[in-house]
Amino acid sequence: KFAKEFFEKDFDLIIGSRFKKKNPFLRDGMPFLRYFTNKIMSTFTSLLLNIKLTEFHTGYKIFSRNFAQKVPYLNCSNNYLFSFQVLLQAKYFNLKYDEISISSSYEGFKTSCNYSNGFIYLIQNFREITNFILARANIKNNNVFPKKN
């Protein structure tokens, strides 16, 4: 229901951001280290790639039919990295995207993304940023960022 107005404006991807309003670690009980690393990486990615979003590491997304038909999202990772890759794909394929404010509950918070997995995820993000930049420059393409027609 809340996404209807966005799709009426022809958005291809809607992202749920925990950072669009107040700090989620204060409002929702988000662990500070999780907030801090997400915020730093999201700000870095936004500035480096000129993608106007407040959060890049969220699983809350709604895709349009146009997105599903144009983007090779099935070539993306099947873990946490998927969320980041599809945002980069939306930018790569010049699709229209926006974000809405969401909240999350961290009561009884548990995650499978421990410190070592978090570090691996961070390295994977830098790899995907590099892949995105190389593909945009037509230097090197891959199955996530294929050569455009």
Model-assigned labels for residue ranges:
Residues 1-80, 107-116, 120-126:
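Acceptor/aglycone-binding surface of glycosyltransferases and processive sugar-polymer synthases
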Residues 8, 66-67, 123-149:
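Terminal low-complexity segments of carbohydrate-biosynthetic enzymes
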Residues 22-27, 48-54, 91, 97, ...:
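Low-complexity, flexible helical/coil segments
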Residues 51-52, 74-78, 87-105:
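Catalytic donor-sugar/metal-binding loop of nucleotide-sugar-dependent glycosyltransferases
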